[in-house]
A protein has these predicted regions:
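Nudix hydrolase/Nudix homology domain
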Residues: 42-44, 118-163
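A short coil-to-beta-strand element that immediately follows conserved catalytic motifs
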Residues: 75-85
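Active-site-adjacent beta-strand/loop module that shapes the phosphate/pyrophosphate-binding cleft
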Residues: 86-115, 127, 150-153
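Conserved Nudix-box catalytic region and its N-terminal flanking loop in Nudix hydrolases
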Residues: 31-71
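Residue-level preference for beta-strand/loop junctions
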Residues: 16-18, 43, 93-95
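Acidic, metal-coordinating catalytic segment for phosphate/diphosphate chemistry
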Residues: 1-23, 158-159
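Conserved hydrophobic "DFG−1" position in protein kinase catalytic cores
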Residues: 26, 34, 100-101, 128
């Protein structure tokens, strides 16, 4: 073990900070709800599962419920929200993404229709896409996570090995 010096102490005292993204994996009959990004300045026109950033002192479940209401316009039951996948972005972007899901029998009877954008305007429209046939124009790290989730993996890294 190397002795502690002023240089190593200073280097290790700077804490790494992550941006935490919360995505919704809303799956119905093998189809995933994806939104087309709009008015965000990043990836506009590309598809991804509805998402938002984790707020200070907010739990992942609270964030998922908030994102569902704000982005999609639906109410999720916090007791039914579960963790489906985690993606660690090691590209240098400093991001960790948690993908949460809920049983979607409520969506089929709740009067919500794909295509309706939520109140925040981060998405221009929504649609249901087969997990086995995702749109070509999709945010890369979201595609990696969704493919791994569909294959049964609970964790992935981005960029994925071989990308």
């Amino acid at each position: 073990m190397q002795p502690l010096t002023a240089e190593t102490t200073a280097r290790h005292s700077r804490h790494f900070q992550l941006i935490v993204d919360v995505h919704l994996l809303l799956v119905r009959n093998g189809d995933l709800l994806l939104g087309r990004r709009a008015n965000t300045g990043y990836g506009d026109g590309a598809y991804e599962p509805p998402s938002g950033r984790l707020a200070e002192r907010e739990t992942l479940v609270e964030a998922a419920v908030r994102v569902a209401a704000a982005q999609v316009g639906i109410a999720l039951d916090p007791a039914r929200v579960t963790l489906a996948h985690v993606l660690h972005d090691v590209s240098g972007a400093g991001r960790m993404a948690f993908f949460l899901t809920e049983d979607l029998d409520l969506l089929t009877t709740g009067g919500w229709a794909a295509g309706a954008a939520g109140p925040t305007g981060s998405y221009s429209d929504f649609g249901w896409y087969p997990l086995t046939d995702l749109p070509a124009n999709m945010i890369d790290r979201a595609r990696v996570a969704v493919r791994n989730y569909a294959a049964g993996a609970r964790f992935s890294t981005y960029p994925a090995f071989g990308m």
